[in-house]
Regions:
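Catalytic cores of nucleotide-sugar-dependent glycosyltransferases that transfer UDP/GDP/TDP-activated
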Residues: 1-136
Length: 136
């Protein structure tokens, strides 16, 4: 199984003191429609970067709405993460000449196949938040 980030349940009501337009009530109402949904966010690291900064508070808030949300982290060897760092930078406009290197696709696919084999099939929805596990 993939590593599951340990998080608790948040309290959406604490935001009522700063929100005055009824948005919390709307979020709670929309959450009723999703109550019980099994949702898994997947990314490559639990620390640093925008995804981790968002999910650390977002997952507990989803749970406070009754959504069975989890956050899991993929595994990969050093070469996989070097290659996918290049993908990440290329998506932001940097050149990525390594794409032509022999075996790059094989390393990427092999690591993602290993991770795919560790996915828990008991989720209704998977959200992939990084280019590293995009092939899942």
């Amino acid at each position: 199984m993939l590593h599951k980030v340990s998080l608790g349940v948040g309290n959406i009501d604490k935001y009522r003191t700063i929100e005055t337009r009824g948005l919390i009530d709307e979020i709670v109402s929309l959450g009723e429609e999703l109550k019980g949904l099994r949702l898994c966010h997947i990314n490559s690291t639990p620390f640093g970067g925008g995804v981790a900064e968002l999910l650390v508070s977002y997952i507990p808030l989803l749970r406070s709405l009754g959504i069975k949300a989890d956050w899991q982290i993929i595994r990969g060897d050093r070469r996989f993460f070097t290659i996918t760092k290049g993908f990440h930078n290329a998506l932001q406009g940097a050149p990525f000449d390594e794409i032509k290197k022999e075996g790059l696709k094989r390393v990427y696919q092999s690591n993602n196949l290993t991770n795919a084999g560790e996915l828990d099939p008991n989720y209704d929805v998977f959200i992939v938040n990084d280019p590293q596990p995009a092939a899942l």
